[in-house]
Regions:
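Surface-exposed, charged secondary-structure patches
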Residues: 5-9, 38-96
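Low-complexity, flexible helical/coil segments
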Residues: 20, 66-69, 74-78, 109-110, ...
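Short beta-strand segments enriched in hydrophobic/aromatic residues
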Residues: 33, 88-90, 114-115
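Short beta-strand edge/turn micro-motifs at domain boundaries
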Residues: 94-122
Length: 122
């Protein structure tokens, strides 16, 4: 793949994530995350770390607010490794995600999601 087609494929992977979050569709999320993916980040002062199943469980038991958005802020590719910076709104406040991706065969997979979120004031 060329850099342009790799970037397009990475954006498609992030679209699977975004669509899965918007519609609480775990199958779509599973099209974004490698089966060994991990999560680690902050919501306020609380540190959360878990295997990817933790996100799937959360999505199955929670609803995402109607105003949820997911915007790619940037992508950097180095061979078969990439980093994508993404902003999510109306999930737990304003969240900046750093997705780390690996190209496995011809497919890009998110292998880690690292984030920092300031919680929404209730």
């Amino acid at each position: 793949m060329t850099a342009i087609t790799d970037e397009r494929a990475i954006r498609e992977t992030i679209d699977h994530y975004s669509n899965g979050m918007k519609s609480a569709d775990v199958a779509s999320l599973k099209n974004a995350f490698h089966e060994l993916a991990i999560l680690c980040g902050y919501i306020g002062d609380e540190l959360i770390a878990a295997p990817i199943q933790g996100l799937y469980d959360w999505v199955e038991s929670n609803s995402v607010p109607e105003g949820y958005t997911c915007t790619v802020l940037g992508i950097e590719i180095t061979g078969r490794v990439a980093t994508a910076k993404v902003r999510e709104t109306d999930l737990h406040g304003d969240v900046i995600d750093h997705f780390h991706l690996l190209k496995v065969g011809d497919r890009w997979w998110i292998v880690s999601k690292i984030w920092d979120a300031e919680p929404v004031e209730e």
